[in-house]
Every structure is written in structure tokens, then in C-alpha cells.
Swiss-Prot record:
Signal sequence annotation: none
PANTHER family: KU AUTOANTIGEN DNA HELICASE, X-RAY REPAIR CROSS-COMPLEMENTING PROTEIN 6
Region described as Disordered: spans on this chain: 1-22, 38-59, 565-612
Protein name, as recorded: ATP-dependent DNA helicase II subunit 1
Keywords noted in UniProt: ATP-binding, Chromosome, DNA damage, DNA recombination, DNA repair, DNA-binding, Helicase, Hydrolase, Nucleotide-binding, Nucleus, Telomere
Subcellular location: Nucleus; Chromosome, Telomere
GO MF: ATP binding; ATP hydrolysis activity; damaged DNA binding; DNA helicase activity; telomeric DNA binding
Membrane-spanning segments: none
Length: 652
């Protein structure tokens, strides 16, 4: 999810709104990687001929994953902290000379990542010799209780006031203790972390000869998320999918996929009461689950010194005539009525803006869901989910409402005020079923969607349809169906995560190169470009057949539709209208520069530059090519391509 400040509705924002900023404050996030360095985690998978097989050890894959996440955060979240703690190492180093936590090595201290931190981690990932010096496993290993206590101290000293603090634990050992007393100590240390406001996210790794079993130890250590948890109120999979080393899909990709799903904490857009009737309210939270990602201009950077620094900005108002700084108490709001500026006091402005009451979601009726056309959507839909923070029992009532709407195939019509000073809107309350992926894991939780409905002046009139509409034939439809079937995405599902915005990625890549003092890339990596070779291999023959069928159908349609030239029709004896006069046609004057053999090279180049070359007839194109000794075989598209190639060779 995007940051809360990006999710705030922008249509009614105003600088002087007196709203509760506690719900919208910028929430800083601190992530500490704890990566196990044991002999099994350092063991590389056996070599195979499969090009997609693993090449990295689990520890190396985890470090590369942390490196990629640090690269992303240095641009997208410049105020968030990130650190890397290795445990089970032969060396003990916490950057402060403290040797209390044995076999714990703080590779990157919990702090806002700098360019030097990213470079050092990159060198460690790419340089095997340097990695071998640090990644030496201890004989006895590290106690998991020591690791959790060390993480507690790091969070307490480095990020004491952060609203989100998370420990990413990467290991393949599903029972890291020897006796039950060690397990009790570890559970106590984990509870201390949770009491501190930190969360533990486990990223388990299964070896080829051993499956990771959470129930042996980590089910008592890692608490699952629940709807009542304010940091993760949306019910997601309580456990992360186990990554398997040595498979065709690399371990690195599995780890990146798992960590990206938890890389950004879920933050509520709003927390409001949902009123089902008089004196019947429940608590809900709203989330923007799908949002267009745009360029994040989160801060200004000053590059005039020895190193770039984030600018702390401030705003002040100045009078035009005297350049005197105007205090906020001296400012007045004014609106023009009839050419005169009418001023209002701050209290009057507040009364005007809050005339519709407090923020609320109020159900005013129900309608069949079939009454809602697909185009009635004026803004981003908001997903709402129950919250027990303000009203106990909200989850049960919310679930009953959602199931009843699904069963009855109905939707709710609601009066929706998102926040104070916001204009009310009418929205449709649409139920959503739970969606699961092929592994049975939850892809989308059950809940309700708030879809903003248009007012009367938001609806535009459809343009008048064309008089003569050419319709396709059944033969063309059948041939196109074959082409579409060959171009289906895997399992017929579009996954936006596989096709990142190329413009946005290029923007981030340039910023990353500037921040890390690297060479600027030459061209972007655009995964939205069609795979032409694969398309031609799959259905090139079918496309050719479709083109031939299309030309035949169009020729037959032209013969049956367009009138033929023939003798002048005789006048109807019963027609009283006078016959139209024949207009004498003037002989066509040959244009200057055009010879008897058709268009010159310069004229054809001009037509091509205007994008009108495809409007030339086949006869004209063939004659032009024939005069220049070029082949005239093929379809019109081939002729056009041949003409353009000839002009390009001439430099026109």
C-alpha cells in the first residue's frame, strides 16, 4: 500500500482545515533483517544443467533480497530505517564494541540507508572473498533468545518512536533450541518485542531433504495477524509461504516475493463508524488496495554541499506591497459574489464546511446489484473491513451484512463523508467474496467495497452512433478467436506485479544512479513491450490467414455495397424533378515536379512523413516501386514497408 499521505483524498483538501492529523501523520517504518548464518544456510545447491536452477546459497539469496529492498527504500521511502543483523557468525560485532550478544554481527546498523551502506552491501553480495570472511558460521551457533534480545536493544536505541518496527527473520532451522528452558526464554524475548510494539515476520526456508515445520517452535514465537490488530487489520495469510531451495524457481525470487508482500505496512485511509440504522453503528477501516503509483516527490534534496542532504522546508506568507511577513491570524478567507469579495471568519468557514455533519458511512437503502452499471464509478473504490477498536462486536455484524448482501445479490446505497470538511458523496456498498490463489492462500479478503457514484452533472452524453457501421463476419470472428486463444496470459490472469510502470522504473533508476554515484543507464527496461518473436511463433500463421480472409471479406462487401459505374440512368417518367445538369470537368493540371510516371521520391517522402502513405492505392504503390526496380509482390502492408525502406535508404 502507498503511504497514508498519498492516500488522502485530494479533491477537498485545504491548507486551513482543522482536522485530526493523528490519523494522517507520516508513519515511519523500521525494518531489521535477521539472517541465519549456519552451515546449511551457506550450502550451495548442487549444480544442474537447468538454467533456472538456484545458484545462490540461502544466506546469499537473503542478502541479495535485502540489497534490492534497500535500493528501493533509499528512493521510495527516504525516511524509513533498515538494518541487517547476521546471527550464528564466528565474529561478534555490534558496531559499538559490545560483545554481550555472542555470534551476532551487525552488518548494517538500523538507520536511514545511505549511499555508502548500499555500496557496501552490494560489494558484499558481489565479492565472494569478502563474503567468506564475514559469513563464517560459529560451531555452536547463536541462541534465538539472544537474537531477539539483540533486536530489542537495536529497536529501542535506534528507532524508539517509530510507529512501525518489524523484524524479518530468515532461517531454515525449525527448532533452534536444545532444551525446553531455551524455548521458554525465546518466547519471553519475543513477547518483550511485541510489548514494545514490534512485530516478527518469519521467512522460512526448506532444504531439499528437510521440510520446515512451524509447529515445532515458531508457532509459539510468531503471532499471526488478526482483524483486531491495528497494524494489519486486513486478514492476510497468517504464515509466509515456505521458500524451497534447489527448485527451478530460484530461492531469491521466492524470498523477494514474500518480503515484498510485507515490505510496506498496511495503513488505514480512515477509521469511521458504519451506521446500519438509528442507534446501530459498527467500526470499520478503509483501505486503498489498488492505486496508480506515481512519481513520489517526497522531499527536496540540496546538492550544493559535500554530500546531498534532505531539505527541511517552511512556508510563510508575505504582503505584495511591503514584503512584510503576514501572520496566520491576519489571514482571511474571501469568496467572490457578484464581483465583490465577501470575507468570512475562521469560525464561519468551519460552520460552512461542517454543515453536513461528522464523518460517517450511513446506509440509506438497498438495491439489486444488477441496477448498478459497470461505468458508474467516478473515483478509486475503497475497501472497508471491520475494526473492534471503537465498537465491540463489529466483526460479527459486518460479516453478517456482507454474507446477506452476497446471498441476496444486493448492494447498499450509502451516504459517505470521508473526513471532516469533506463534501458528502453517494456510494455503492458492494460485497466481495474471498479470493484464493492456486495454493489455497488468501489473495483478497472478504469485505465490502465503497464505490463512489456519479452525480447527474458527472454523466456525459454518449456520442451519436455512426450511420453506416461495418460489422464483422462469422468467419472473421472464428479466425480471430483462434488468435486470441493463442495469446492468452498464463491461466487467463493479468498480474500487474509482472509489468511495472516503465516510466516510473526509469525515474527511480535515474535517481538510484545519482544517489549511488553510478553511471546513468542508456535505456529503460520496458516489460510492457510485446514479445514479437513469441507472438509470431504462436500465431503468425493464423494472423496471415486472418489478413487474407479480411481482404476477401472487405472486397466482397465493397462489391455488394458501393454502386458501380455504368450508363447514366434514364429519368423516371413519373419523376417531376428536373434532371441535374452535367458539369463540365476541367482537365487535371499536372503538379509542378510531378512527371508522367507518378510521384517523385520527394513527394512520396512528404506523403510518408505526413503518415498518409497507407492511404495510397495499391496500384499507385506498385507503379512507384516498379519504376524503381523494386519488387511489387505481396500485400499492401508489404508494399508500404518496401516503399518506406527505399526512402530510408535514400535518406528521405
Amino acid at each position: 500500500m502507498a503511504d497514508t499521505q498519498d492516500n488522502r483524498p485530494g479533491e477537498e483538501e485545504d491548507d486551513d482545515e482543522e482536522i485530526d492529523e493523528s490519523a494522517y501523520k507520516t508513519m515511519k517504518d523500521a525494518v531489521l533483517f535477521a539472517i541465519d548464518v549456519s552451515p546449511s544456510m551457506l550450502e550451495r545447491p548442487p549444480k544442474t544443467e537447468d538454467k533456472k536452477a538456484d545458484r545462490d546459497s540461502p544466506t546469499s539469496a537473503a542478502l541479495k533480497c535485502a540489497y534490492q529492498l534497500m535500493q528501493q527504500r533509499i528512493i521510495s521511502n527516504p525516511n524509513d530505517m533498515m538494518g541487517i543483523l547476521l546471527f550464528g557468525t564466528e565474529k561478534t560485532d555490534l558496531k559499538d564494541g559490545d560483545s554481550t550478544f555472542q555470534h551476532c554481527y551487525l552488518l548494517a546498523d538500523l538507520d536511514v540507508p545511505s549511499a555508502q551502506d548500499v555500496k557496501r552491501l552490494r560489494d558484499l553480495v558481489e565479492d565472494e572473498e569478502e563474503a567468506e570472511q564475514i559469513l563464517k558460521p560459529a560451531k555452536d551457533g547463536a541462541s534465538i533468545a539472544t537474537v531477539l534480545f539483540c533486536a530489542n536493544q537495536i529497536f529501542t536505541t535506534k528507532a524508539p518512536n517509530f510507529s512501525s518496527r518489524r523484524l524479518f527473520l530468515v532461517t531454515d532451522n525449525d527448532y533452534p533450541v536444545n532444551v525446553k528452558a531455551d524455548k521458554d526464554t525465546a518466547v519471553t524475548r519475543a513477547r518483550d518485542l511485541y510489548d514494545l510494539g514490534c512485530t516478527i515476520d518469519l521467512f522460512p526456508i526448506s532444504q531439499p531433504d528437510q521440510t520446515f515445520d512451524r509447529s515445532r517452535f515458531y508457532d509459539d514465537l510468531v503471532y499471526p495477524t488478526s482483524p483486531s490488530d491495528p497494524d494489519a487489520p486486513i486478514a492476510v495469510a497468517t504464515t509466509t509461504k515456505v521458500a524451497k531451495s534447489g527448485e527451478g524457481i530460484t530461492l531469491l525470487k521466492q524470498l523477494i516475493s514474500s518480503i515484498n508482500s510485507k515490505a510496506t505496512p498496511r495503513r488505514a485511509l480512515f477509521s469511521l463508524p458504519l451506521e446500519l440504522g438509528p442507534d446501530l453503528r459498527i467500526g470499520v477501516k478503509g483501505y486503498i488496495l489498488i492505486k496508480r503509483q506515481e512519481h513520489a516527490k517526497s522531499c527536496y534534496v540540496w546538492v550544493g554541499g559535500d554530500k546531498p542532504q534532505i531539505v527541511s522546508s517552511s512556508t510563510s506568507h508575505m504582503a505584495d506591497d511591503t514584503a512584510r511577513v503576514v501572520e496566520k491570524t491576519e489571514l482571511r478567507k474571501a469568496y467572490k459574489f457578484g464581483g465583490d469579495a465577501i470575507t468570512f471568519t475562521p469560525d464561519e468557514i468551519i460552520k460552512i464546511r461542517q454543515a453536513f455533519g461528522d464523518p460517517i458511512i450511513r446506509i440509506i437503502g438497498f438495491k439489486p446489484i444488477s441496477c448498478l452499471p459497470i461505468w458508474t464509478n467516478t473515483n478509486k473504490a475503497t475497501f472497508i473491513y471491520p475494526s473492534e477498536a471503537d465498537f465491540i462486536g463489529s466483526t460479527r455484524v459486518f460479516s453478517a451484512l456482507q454474507q446477506k448482501l452476497l446471498k441476496s445479490k444486493k448492494m447498499g446505497l450509502v451516504w459517505f463523508i470521508a473526513r471532516r470538511n469533506a463534501a458528502p458523496i453517494l456510494s455503492a456498498l458492494i460485497p466481495a467474496e474471498e479470493q484464493t490463489n492456486e495454493d489455497g492462500e488468501q489473495a483478497m479478503p472478504p469485505g465490502l467495497w465503497l464505490v463512489p457514484l456519479p452525480w447527474a452533472d458527472d454523466i456525459r452524453q454518449f456520442p451519436s452512433p455512426a450511420a453506416d457501421v461495418l460489422k464483422t463476419t462469422d468467419a472473421l470472428t472464428d479466425k480471430m478467436r483462434i488468435i486470441i486463444e493463442q495469446l492468452q496470459l498464463p491461466k487467463g490472469v493479468y498480474d500487474p506485479a509482472k509489468y511495472p510502470n516503465p516510466d516510473l522504473q526509469w525515474f527511480y533508476r535515474i535517481l538510484q544512479a545519482m544517489a549511488l554515484e553510478e553511471e546513468l543507464p542508456e535505456k529503460p527496461d520496458d516489460k510492457t513491450m510485446p514479445k514479437f518473436r513469441q507472438i509470431d511463433k504462436r500465431c503468425g500463421e493464423y494472423i496471415t490467414e486472418y489478413g487474407a480472409e479480411f481482404e476477401a471479406a472487405f472486397a466482397q462487401l465493397a462489391v455488394s455495397t458501393f454502386p458501380h459505374r455504368g450508363k447514366r440512368a434514364s429519368a423516371d417518367p413519373g419523376d417531376d424533378k428536373p434532371a441535374p445538369k452535367r458539369v463540365k470537368k476541367e482537365p487535371k493540371v499536372k503538379e509542378e515536379g510531378e512527371d508522367d510516371e507518378g510521384l517523385t521520391d520527394e513527394q512520396m517522402a512528404t506523403v510518408n512523413n505526413k503518415g498518409q502513405i497507407s492511404k495510397q492505392t495499391v496500384a499507385v504503390l506498385k507503379a512507384w516501386l516498379s519504376q524503381r526496380g523494386e519488387s511489387t509482390s505481396g500485400k499492401k502492408a508489404d508494399l508500404v514497408e518496401r516503399v518506406q525502406g527505399y526512402l530510408e535508404g535514400k535518406g528521405l
